Amino acid sequence: FKYDTPSMQAHVKAVFQDHKFVSDSDSVPKVGEPFGILLDQTNMYAESGGQQADTGSLVIDGKAEFEVTDVQVSNGYVLHIGFLKYGTLRVDDQVMVNYDEARRRPLRNNHTGTHILNFGLREILGDHVDQKGSLVAPTKLRFDFSHKAPVNVAELAKIEDMSNDFIKRDVNVYGKDMSLEEAQKIPGLRAVFGESYPNPVRVVAIEFDVEEMAKDLTNPRWRSTSVEFCGGTHVRRTGEIGRLVITEESGIAKGTRRIVAVTGDEASEVSRTAEEAAQRLEDI
């Protein structure tokens, strides 16, 4: 997957603050306030497609360290936003780019979890379910979708069970760039209605290899799994997610529902709390 190298070398191409480019970090107009660094390449994920940005650092060993608190795309460029901890960063400096794995890991879990949840919603509620929005944060995932009625407890249980079956089976997650025209032929492919996608487009599939799909585009087998257009970060195997627990279901607009869920350590904590509460009720 893209962005998977935890550390990589890059060169500073620009220093940016308050709509101005400067030659080095000593020349930023507003000292003490965050500014941006543009690199020739990066392993950090900029906020996009509902997934929150990576954090991390840009380091010149022993000479300078820049703490990255946010990564955003601005006019097609990836801007690393943050604060200089010490030293000076100049245009053409070589830096080590390090993302924070402790933040990236739950983001990966929650993003692949969102794909699994999307598939489960369609399977249990019907093909009319379309994604209306999403949030992938380290602590939770949120998914908005088209559906006219509240999702009842039995349906939520089925969706959660189907999601956890994917996780327990510990199947591979695949990603590959394909031409938009070819990718749109894959049966069961999920995309956000009205969204403009690049060409080529990145296809992320669970269990079946995207390269295998590309050789047999119309095979109905592909309907039996999650296949989506996506440029985000994902786990390599579904077992890494640990568990998915739905914590909330609500209506946010006419014909639009919202589900909030947690994965990994957060899911274990929520389950433990629920079990303790159930035990206390039993004891009353």
Task: Identify the residue ranges that each predicted region occupies.
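A glycine- and charged-residue-rich anion-binding loop/surface
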Residues: F1-I284
